A protein has these predicted regions:
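Active-site cofactor/cluster-binding pocket
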Residues: 1-189
Length: 189
């Protein structure tokens, strides 16, 4: 299996942890994996994105334009910003959520419905994940990363076994947050 995955969002959404969980799950399955993260001003609400490349013959962790199989978007505006990296037949799974990154707020912001419409018009395969009800059910919005990871896994878009992802969660999430994160991961089963 060869898979190129980009995760994108804003600081504080758990994008980096989700990237590390995907990489750990791939390694548990014996697959070669390389990843790179750009976190910039993440702690201040800036843009965050991760590139993950799984499979043989990968020489660099960076994914070229038009080469991503999957774009996992934690925030609509950032998802649109990373869309040029998606293959023509690639898949987008994005949270139906807009969080104004600091960089966007400096320029006056954007309309989330316009971002959603743009994705609908330009992505060959698009799944918009409605996360607000899940936040209410689970009692926390801090599990966005595991909700999206679970939705991507349930759809088969990651190409990894759910058991490998669950094992990666158990190995990488602190014990006091483990139960909530596993519930979030399994929410869309």
């Amino acid at each position: 299996m060869n898979k190129n995955i980009i995760l994108c969002g804003v600081g504080g959404q758990g994008t980096v942890l989700a990237s590390r969980l995907i990489s750990a799950a791939a390694m548990k399955e014996g697959l070669p994996v390389q990843s790179a993260e750009t976190i910039g001003m993440a702690q201040r609400g800036g843009s965050v994105f991760s590139h993950i490349r799984i499979g043989e013959g990968v020489n660099t962790p960076m994914i070229g334009l038009g080469q991503a199989d999957l774009l996992l978007g934690f925030e609509l505006g950032e998802t649109v910003r990373q869309l040029p990296y998606l293959k023509k037949d690639g898949r987008v799974i994005a949270a139906e959520r807009a969080v104004m990154p600091v960089t966007a707020s400096l320029g006056g912001g954007y309309d989330p419905s316009v971002m959603k419409q743009y994705l609908q018009e330009h992505a060959a395969a698009l799944t918009i994940v409605k996360v607000e009800k899940a936040f209410e059910t689970l009692g926390s919005a801090k599990v966005l990363n595991l909700l999206l990871l679970g939705a991507a896994s349930a759809s088969g878009a990651l190409g990894l076994q759910r058991s490998s992802l669950l094992a990666a969660i158990e190995d990488n999430v602190p014990p006091k947050f483990l139960d909530l994160n596993k519930k979030a991961f399994c929410y869309f089963e």
